[in-house]
Amino acid sequence: MRELVLFLAKTLVDQPDAVQVMETEGPEAIILELSVAQEDMGKVIGKQGRIAKAIRTVVKAATDKNAKPVFVEIQ
């Protein structure tokens, strides 16, 4: 799942080398923390959060039904 978020974010930004995804696995969920360059933050979030919501929807759709839920946080 980490690679999927990394791919999606790198295709959206002007500085793909600055994109990082940290994965934290807890007892009930997996949290993916996406960080990008400050200048690219608007491109990843989008107007009214539409791009961020789309990224979260794709990740949710790619998650197995019986697996832990995956949450994407953008920093």
Please describe what each predicted stretch is.
Residues 1-41, 53, 57-75:
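RNA-contacting regions in translation and RNA-metabolism proteins
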